[in-house]
């Protein structure tokens, strides 16, 4: 199966394992909750989907790479303890708590979440001295004498032997105690992630043209030659940083991530051509509706590779614009909930809205910062939620600073006034994003009509979480018209239904 199907299968298993009866007991007892074994080639996103599942289910998450562990760190250190059996004292061997099990308890204390996922990567690549202990762990969820706490589900991952010389197979008795999920690289599925995650458009459009270069592993006289999804994703992030700093992106950089000489060389050549298209086509002016009159004609007459690159640039700029608006909208919704809670607390303490509320505002700021840091340390903080925390904490800090210079102090009225100013800025940003979306459709209509380029635009907006969130909340007549024409209406409607709606209820 592909990585998206694997994620859904694992998520379904987690939901089932976490299900309790009316007395708070797990319907499937922990001893019968089979650990999941995710088997797949390196760099296809196994670890990433586990972090996503933990965030989506709002449970704890602890991750370990087992190749870094010795028998002592996994099992704990031995020590001599005194026990009494039938009135006779004996000295027996005991073990300190495993570092891995201890990390689970530490995560529970830090986050307050009693349920979670313990993810052990490269489980089939452990040293020979640790192998018996790992097999025991997979069967009984015990390291030494210490078990994984109830409510924590074990998920493991590993590479097939053809990708890792140190990987070894399990016997039938072990496999019969695991939920085995095999994952294969799939470019179409990865592309949906890439569009939504704003992977650099040069990477996406290059792979649209050279799909066989998405994932390749081969043996050469000089060693392994390979390129993986992780490599493309990491290269994308580095290209963005290089561009922001005005640094040169060349073959020397590319081959550090794309460890296949021929593919690295071809992508570096394509990137040079891509940057020329970016300069020529004035993408920002397409979004604001001020592009030169002849630009659409040039795009229509361009060869295939150029049209793919141009559409990649347009989609990337559009999704980035919509994502910015959606993230600010979610931050505003989060801020609204914080203000509503603060208002209730002020009323409960008898503090008027025009009275100094510095103490409570400061306490709220501290609580928010603590929650943010806790979620971040536990790998449970998404980019959207992080921005939401930063926006409201920044607003509260601003009000405290302003209030310190006024006789009235930091009042709730001042806080509401500043928040409403942010809402006005948000409305302007939403209008700008809506205009940009409309302008993009106008340009693609003029240049390509109902051709493959329009199909690419509609499809990529449909798989973009930010794109569908924005369209779902604010509409786009041209999107729905072309979506219906291209027989994607039902798919788009289904995707839209899965997006959390954002509503800002003003006082």
Predicted regions and their residues:
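AAA+ P-loop NTPase catalytic core and its hallmark functional loops
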Residues: 1-212, 217
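Exposed alpha-helical structural elements
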Residues: 5, 9, 103, 189, ...
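Generic hydrophobic, helix-prone segments enriched in Leu/Val/Ile
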Residues: 10, 100-104, 242, 419, ...
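Terminal-proximal interaction/regulatory segments of ATP-powered molecular machines
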Residues: 300-507
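Amphipathic alpha-helical interaction segments
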Residues: 103, 198, 214, 240, ...
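Extended hydrophobic/Leu-rich segments
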Residues: 6, 97-105, 299, 364, ...
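Alpha-helical lid/collar subdomain of P-loop NTPases
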Residues: 196-359
């Amino acid at each position: 199966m592909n990585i998206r199907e694997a994620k859904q299968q694992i998520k379904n298993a987690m939901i089932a394992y976490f299900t309790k009866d009316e007395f708070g007991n797990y319907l499937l007892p922990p001893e019968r909750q089979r650990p999941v074994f995710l088997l797949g080639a390196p760099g296809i996103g196994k670890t990433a989907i586990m972090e996503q599942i933990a965030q989506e289910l709002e449970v704890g998450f602890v991750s370990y790479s087992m190749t870094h562990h010795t028998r002592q760190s996994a099992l704990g250190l031995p020590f001599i303890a005194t026990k009494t059996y039938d009135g006779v004292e004996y000295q027996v061997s005991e073990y300190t708590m495993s570092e891995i099990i201890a990390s689970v308890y530490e995560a529970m204390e830090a986050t307050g979440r009693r349920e979670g996922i313990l993810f052990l990567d490269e489980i089939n690549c452990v040293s020979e001295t640790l192998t018996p202990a790992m097999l025991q762990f997979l069967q009984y969820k015990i390291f030494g004498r210490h078990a994984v706490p109830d409510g924590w589900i074990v998920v493991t991952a590993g590479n097939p032997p053809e990708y890792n010389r140190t990987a070894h197979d399990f016997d039938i008795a072990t496999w019969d105690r695991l939920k085995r999920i095999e994952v294969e690289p799939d470019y179409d599925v990865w592309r949906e992630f890439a569009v939504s995650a704003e992977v650099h458009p040069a990477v996406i459009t290059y792979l649209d043209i050279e799909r066989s270069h998405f994932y390749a592993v081969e043996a050469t006289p000089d060693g392994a030659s390979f390129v993986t999804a992780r490599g493309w994703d990491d290269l994308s992030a580095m290209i963005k940083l290089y561009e922001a700093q005005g640094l040169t992106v060349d073959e020397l950089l590319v081959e550090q991530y794309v460890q296949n000489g021929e593919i690295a060389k071809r992508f570096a050549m394509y990137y040079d051509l891509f940057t020329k298209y970016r300069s020529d086509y004035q993408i920002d002016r397409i979004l604001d509706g001020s592009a030169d009159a002849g630009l659409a004609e040039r795009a229509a007459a361009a060869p295939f590779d150029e049209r793919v690159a141009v559409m990649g640039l347009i989609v990337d700029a559009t999704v980035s614009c919509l994502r910015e608006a959606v993230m600010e909208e979610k931050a505003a919704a989060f801020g609204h909930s914080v203000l509503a809670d603060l208002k209730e607390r002020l009323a409960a303490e008898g503090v008027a809205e025009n009275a100094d509320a510095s103490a409570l505002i400061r306490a709220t700021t501290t609580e928010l910062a603590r929650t943010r840091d806790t979620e971040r340390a536990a790998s449970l903080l998404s980019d959207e939620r992080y921005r939401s925390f930063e926006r409201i904490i920044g607003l509260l800090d601003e009000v405290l600073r302003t209030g310190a210079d006024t006789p009235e102090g930091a009042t709730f009225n001042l806080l509401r006034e500043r928040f409403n100013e942010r809402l006005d800025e948000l409305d302007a940003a939403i209008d700008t994003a809506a205009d940009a979306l409309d302008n993009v459709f106008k340009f693609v209509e003029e240049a390509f009509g109902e051709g493959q380029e329009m199909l690419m635009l509609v499809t990529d907006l449909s798989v973009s979480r930010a794109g569908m969130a924005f369209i779902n909340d604010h509409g786009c007549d041209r999107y729905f018209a072309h979506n219906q024409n291209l027989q994607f209406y039902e798919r788009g409607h289904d995707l839209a239904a899965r997006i959390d709606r954002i509503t800002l209820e003003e006082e």
